[in-house]
Amino acid sequence: MRHEAFWLTASDSTEFHVNHWSPTQEPQAIVMLVHGMAEHSKRYAHLGAALAKAGIALYALDLRGHGFTASFGVKGHFGNHNGWQLVLDDIRCLNHHIRQQHHEKPVFIFGHSLGSYLVIDYLLQYCCSVQGVILSSSNYIQSTFRYKLALQVARFERWRLGKQGRSKLLHWLIFNRHQRAFKPQKTLHDWLSSDEKQVKLYAQDPLCGFISTTQLWIDALTGLQRITPISNLVQIDNLLPILIFGGEHDPIHQGHRLIDLANAFRESGNRFVDVKLYPDMRHEPLNEKNSPRVIQDIIEWIKHNARLD
C-alpha cells in the first residue's frame, strides 16, 4: 500500500488538502470520500488501507474549515458567502484530478454524515462524474417545518454572533439530543461509537469535535432543504447504484430514516439501492468494534458494481 498527501487548488484559488491511499499496482476502482462535520480525512486511514489491499484507491479531501484545509480559512467554516457550493466545487475539482490520473477506472463517491448531504447535492449537479454512491450515516426528514425552524434559530444566532461566530446554543440543541440516548454518559461523544477506545481517540484529536460556525449550520440546513424533495432527487441518474448504511443505534437517523432515504431514491425511479443497518452500532460504523465487517461489505459492494468480481 502507498499513502501520499497533497494539495489541490480550488476554483476560487483556495487550496485544499487530500489524503490518498492506493495499492502498489494501478487500482481497479477509485473511491473519493467526503467526511463529516468536525472531523477530517486522516480518520479514514484504516478504510484506505483495507481498500488498497483489495485493489481500490481512496482519495479523501479535508473540507473547508476542516483538517489541514482549515489552515487556509476559519476552522469549522465553509465560507462567508456561497460556502456550500464552494465545497461542492472542491469535490468536483478532486474528481477532475482523479479522472486525469486514472482515466477510465470506475469512480465511486462516499459521503459520511454531513458529507453524505454534500454528496447528494453533488449528484444533483454532477451525477455523470461517478459510477456509484455510498452514503454512510445519512438522514432523511421530509418535514420542511423542522428545517425552517432550525434555520430561523441559526439565522438568529448568526445575527447575534456573526457569520464566523460559534453558537453554543445551536451546538447544544443538536448534539445534546444525540447524547441523551446513551446512559451512563461517559463522554460528550458516546453517540459516535460503542467502542470507547475510538471515542477517546476522537475526543483527544485536536482536529475533531469543535463547534462549527453559524454560517456553516445555515449552509448545511439550506443544503438539506434542497436535497430532500423527491422532485429534486429525480434529477439523479436512476441507473446509479447506491449503497446506504448505518448503525441501528445511531441517534441521528434512528435506523428508520435511512430506510426513508432509500425509499425516497426508489420513489425517484432508482431500482439499484441497497441498504445495510448494523445492529448495536452507532453513528460511525467504520469506527465500531466490528468495523472490519462493515468495510468488507463496502469492498464487496464496490467490486460487484464495478464488475470486478
Give residue spans per PLM region.
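N-terminal cap/lid segment of alpha/beta-hydrolase-fold proteins
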Residues: 1-23
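Active-site glycine-rich loops that stabilize anionic/oxyanionic intermediates
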Residues: 31, 35-39, 113, 248
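Conserved alpha/beta-hydrolase
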Residues: 43, 48-74
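Alpha/beta-hydrolase active-site loop
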Residues: 79-99
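Alpha/beta-hydrolase fold nucleophile elbow
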Residues: 102-113
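Alpha/beta-hydrolase-fold enzymes
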Residues: 121-207
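Short beta-strand/loop motif that positions the catalytic acidic residue
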Residues: 244-246
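Catalytic active-site module of serine/aspartate enzymes centered on a nucleophile-bearing elbow/loop
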Residues: 268-309
